[in-house]
Amino acid sequence: KIYDFFKRHYFYKKLIDDIFLEKKISLHQQNKINNILLINNWLLENINPITQGETIIDFHPITIINRAKATSDQFNDLYSILLVYNKYESFYKFISYNNISYPFTFVKIDNYWTIIDPYNGFYFVKDNNLASVNDIKNNNFKILSLHKTNDNKNYIFFDTLVNEDILKNKINKIFINFDTKDVIDSKHKYKRGGRSYLQDPINRIKYEILKIFNII
């Protein structure tokens, strides 16, 4: 079991290296932002959505890669893990709106948190930077897509076709009551959501020790 754990750990490290060797395209002139988007781009090109009626078995995140298919939450799970392996703080969690739960990935860049929708290929910008959580809560952002879109600016959001204005309004409403940056920062990284930090052996040991002493 320990051998398998370390084997998966080095698999993720190598995968990150391979992604950046393979993906030589530029999606943004800022390198930090470009790397965040390149990982999402790689996922969209290599992992397909699960179709209705398919059996889903998820022993660990590498299962997703081997199967090359994933549910929306599994996209976010794997994406947040790969971001952590690329030295970003990241987690994912479900956000409820109108009795529907939507998974999103959160990643910290330059001391602020931004939100990515890796399953649908959406990211949110303000000026020439990724929009902060507070920008999105205040409806001060634009939507960009890693998918090719048509001239009518229609997007697929969890299997529903919506135009840009409707989608922007919906994203704002989903996050309007969500945590601010300070609230996210105040939470221990192991308690923010997902399992992005628990694939690394050192982090896993720290997590288990903190659990034993009821610190988290």
Q: Where in the sequence are the language-model features?
A:
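Secondary-structure boundary elements
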Residues: K1-R67, N214
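Small-side-chain structural scaffolding
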Residues: S26, I36, N76, S80-I81, ...
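Aromatic-acidic/polar surface patches that form glycan- and anion
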Residues: K32, A68, S72, E164
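Loop/turn elements at helix/coil->beta-strand transitions in domains of secreted/extracellular proteins
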Residues: K32-L37, V84-S90, D110-W113
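Active-site neighborhood of thiol-dependent amide/isopeptide-bond enzymes
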Residues: N46-F104, K108
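His-Asp-centered catalytic microenvironments across diverse enzyme cores
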Residues: S101-P103, V107-I216
